């Protein structure tokens, strides 16, 4: 005949069950950050990233495009990073995690934001699309400060690299095309600590319009599939 456990034992069993339930609930997957900051490249406008922003919005995310002014490299990338900071302060609530996607020069401006103003606890995912992380030979054709920052071995590029270790919990992704004639060599768009992907997109400007690239971004930043 089974005996009813004493009240103290029943209480202990109930507490154990409650603790187990709490732990199991705590292991449920976290909802991915909803806010996505999109930073366009040199000579680009907010319209350049319209297709990507629309796809992210359709996936239930909240994209914000940061149109850089001026967008022609006339000022240094560290200065432009302040515009990214201002947009984040306006559109992303304090202490809320978010992701950043930078295209071309915008990827370097976004990295400068991380170095100067970013909080590692808030950056969930960093994606760069055809950004010259190791510089581009094309930058030798202009003496504009922002373009000089994109020259191989520039002081700017040397300054942003050492700060990457602070963002060890951030998911880093780079996407490039081996056919790029703006970022030379195209391998400059990779980072040693990132997951580096390559898609055969015909031209540098088409990277943010190509459906494969847009789908990759949505897949990485959007909510996980149900079931």
Regions flagged by a language model, labelled:
Residues 3-14:
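N-terminal export leaders
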């Amino acid at each position: 005949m089974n005996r009813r456990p004493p009240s103290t034992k029943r209480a202990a069993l109930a507490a154990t069950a409650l603790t187990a339930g709490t732990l199991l609930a705590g292991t449920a997957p976290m909802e991915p950050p909803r806010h996505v900051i999109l930073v366009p490249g040199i000579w680009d406008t907010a319209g350049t990233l319209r297709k990507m922003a629309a796809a992210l919005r359709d996936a239930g995310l909240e994209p914000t495009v940061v149109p850089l002014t001026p967008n022609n490299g006339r000022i240094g990338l560290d200065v432009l990073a302040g515009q990214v900071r201002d947009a984040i302060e306006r559109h992303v609530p304090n202490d809320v995690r978010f992701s950043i996607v930078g295209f071309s020069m915008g990827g370097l401006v976004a990295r400068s934001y991380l170095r100067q103003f970013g909080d590692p606890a808030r950056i969930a995912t960093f994606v760069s699309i055809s950004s010259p992380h190791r510089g581009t030979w094309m930058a030798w054709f202009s003496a504009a400060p922002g373009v000089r920052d994109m020259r191989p071995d520039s002081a700017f590029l040397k300054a942003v690299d050492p700060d990457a270790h602070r963002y060890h919990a951030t998911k880093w992704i780079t996407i490039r095309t081996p056919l790029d004639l703006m970022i030379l060599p195209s391998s400059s768009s990779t980072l040693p600590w990132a997951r580096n992907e390559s898609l055969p997109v015909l031209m540098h400007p088409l990277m943010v319009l190509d459906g494969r690239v847009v789908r990759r971004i949505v897949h990485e930043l959007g909510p996980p599939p149900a079931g």
